[in-house]
Amino acid sequence: MPREIITIQVGQCGNQIGMEFWKQLCLEHGIGKDGLLEDFATQGGDRKDVFFYQADDQHYIPRALLVDLEPRVINGIQNSEYRNLYNHENIFVAEHGGGAGNNWASGYHQGEQVVDDIMDMIDREADGSDSLEGFVLCHSIAGGTGSGMGSYLLETLNDRYSKKLVQTYSVFPNQMETSDVVVQPYNSLLTLKRLTLNADCVVVLDNTALNRIAVERLHLANPTFAQTNSLVSTVMSASTTTLRYPGYMNNDLVGLLASLIPTPRCHFLMTGYTPLTVERQVNMIRKTTVLDVMRRLLQTKNIMVSSYARNKEASQAKYISILNIIQGEVDPTQVHESLQRIRERKLVNFIEWGPASIQVALSRKSPYVQTTHRVSGLMLANHTSIRHLFSKCLGQYEKLRKKQAFLDNYRKFPMFEDNDLSEFDESREIIESLVDEYKACESPDYIKWGMEDAGEANVAAALDSKLVV
């Protein structure tokens, strides 16, 4: 029985990456822009109903909600070639359409005011599922709607659907460019608190790294949002292939995540992908082997999260877990030999308190998407160096907070009125604790460190409790 997943796209960024994701899924399953199955899509074996359901006229509709506080991006989707794909009852745009003004507090407050309308949509989708497994939230952490309203929805989902998994694809801002959102550090910190406490898994999509990959690997001088969004949709679709083309393992979300997240708080994943699309067009077609793909996935230049670690810290960073999803014509003996070669060459530095092995899931490719390579791979990895990304967010927050800069923007809203800034302080403490825990993971004594935290034992079965019988 398929375990359905409902996708919730929040804000400008969330809806843009969500749209690219659905385009990719339609291509891979032979579904036309109007939701009707293409005449050539005659091969079975795929599970469309994890992400789609069929209307009475047999056309496929995404299990998706499109939510925004200003209409521009959603209007663009409704005027695009894909306008008939979505269920229009699942589109929410705020009546005033003024957006959140890149202010987390505004997005959160407006989320409180409209949550009943949005939860009605979510409940309706959930009731239409035979065996709902969970939710996927697409958003950014730096603006107003995706961060603030996304945070409120995360808390509400956690409360209302406590037994269901919540996974997010969270876009982190580009740290190499001057942001036009001056309060970005405040928004990011407040959102990170909710991602730590209210999500079961966060796939970190770091715009800094995505831009670097687009420039260095894809040879694009000035990557556009559309080009970096296509990288994101590649990662999102590849990370769901084992759910949509089921094999013996990792064919549901809880199985996928349980292998990657051994400890509840450390649930932030980084990704790597090879070979990349435009790269194949620029260079000559190369021979792709399982070993070649698996080795490339471990190279820093292919990893889609920037590490701000200094040299010494970088050498101490360790993998907590790795899952490689390999697509294409693959012989399992090649996988075994590749793993052996990687072990012999000591290419991976694992933690000392857990299973030190790369897990591999084999998945077939879509028969409807032609590629020039035989094998491609996605790496989902839990790696301690991600703490440096959080430390960077903390450092930027401290700079603004010391100057008491732009706090009046937040004091206008109920959570911060009467100059109550305790929400900032609490968020900072939670992220500092997260950084400390990722650092502790590098030590062989981490298990003891976990026991010192009184609440940890109670949370340890968090993922297990979401195994719905």
Swiss-Prot record:
GO biological process: what's one of them? mitotic spindle organization
SMART domains of this UniProt entry? Tubulin, Tubulin_C
Which positions in this protein are listed as binding GTP?
Answer: A142, G143, G144, T145, G146, S147, G148
User: InterPro entries, per this entry?
Assistant: Gamma_tubulin, Tub_FtsZ_C, Tubulin, Tubulin/FtsZ-like_C, Tubulin/FtsZ_2-layer-sand-dom, Tubulin/FtsZ_GTPase_sf, Tubulin_C, Tubulin_CS
Question: Which CDD domains does the entry mention?
Answer: gamma_tubulin (cd02188)
Show the Pfam families listed in the entry: Tubulin, Tubulin_C
Report which superkingdom the organism of origin falls in. Answer: Eukaryota
Biological role stated in the UniProt entry: Tubulin is the major constituent of microtubules. The gamma chain is found at microtubule organizing centers (MTOC) such as the spindle poles, suggesting that it is involved in the minus-end nucleation of microtubule assembly.
Family note: Belongs to the tubulin family.
Question: Mind telling me what this protein is named?
Answer: Tubulin gamma-2 chain
Gene source species: Oryza sativa subsp. japonica
Gene encoding the protein = TUBG2
